[in-house]
Amino acid sequence: MKAKKILKLLLLLVFFSCQKNKNQETSSWTQITPKLFFQEREEKFYLKSGGHECSFPKEKLPFKKVIVLTTSQLGYISALGEEERISGIAGAQYVYSEKIRNLIQENKIQTVGTDQKYNLEKILALKADAVLTNYMPNLADTYEIFRKNGINVIFLDEYLEEKPLEKTAYIKLFGKFFGVEKKAEKIYQEIETNYLTLKNQAAKAGNSPAVLSGEMFGNHWFLAGGKTFAAQYFKDAGADYILKNNQDEKSISMSFEEIFSKSQSVQYWVNLSNYTTKKELLNKNPAYGKLRVFREGKIFAMNNRQKGDANDYFESGAIRTDLVLRDYIKIFHPEFFPNDTLVYMKELK
């Protein structure tokens, strides 16, 4: 019996020691969002972003030159006024910012390919401090080439965050990258205050209209899962999303028949791509005409700020989540902000 007690005591000591070490390890990281952490230790900067980790010498900070392969991250750089730190960009046709477009025309920012096919020689020649991008599994070999040539590849998947303000919070990391932490924190605090004020206003609305999102691609309807930032927008804007009880953190696909069944009481259909009229939408897929919301409800696309292929919802909208929320509130509850115009959304007539 005595031996068993000693064994139990030893096991407890090991358990609490492991817990202590685990807590110390966790507390040494600065958390920006549930998916984004960094720490500075032993002359190195460490970053955890989603399922990815990287490190580089602290002396690299602040970055002088970066290459951006995903235009959704340009909104953070523009908000900080650090556009001239960009030395290269992929998918230039998707850039909305007038300042960045001008820098490209002046050859101060080099185009380094499309968002799926990069000019490796050009990227390597630019000798940037870091490459910023979303992670694309099919480009894993390309990322390895960057690393072997001494380029820090930083994966930032802000679009996978579950809450809008968590997307905004990425500006804190960009502030760290460019040595403007105080400015980044101030911007975040202003947007957070605006967002929470708007959310509280929406909570006072007398109704929660039913909402459908997404559209058909091929034979499947793709729409936001119930644990995505889009679903959180709908909730914070005082709407009743048809997938509010769904547990998926990414977009999911459903058949048209499933959507038809779930959307009988829907009053608003939002988050469509670049359509300008209901007729154009119907020409794309005549089945839409069977939906009650198509005939009797209101439909909104995310293209009020669109220039060719460039859509500012995916650029400045990544950080200005307060403006996106205000759009949704104005859509779902027209009695709010009667004198304001929509920023990112546009109604299809």
Question: Which positions does each model-derived feature cover?
Answer:
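Extracytoplasmic ligand-binding site segments that recognize negatively charged/polar headgroups
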Residues: 89-99, 138-142, 157-172, 207-232
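Structured C-terminal subdomain patch of bacterial secreted/periplasmic proteins
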Residues: 165-179, 183-186, 271-349
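A short, structured surface patch at a secondary-structure boundary
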Residues: 46-50, 59-124, 130-135
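Sec-dependent signal peptide recognition
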Residues: 4-12
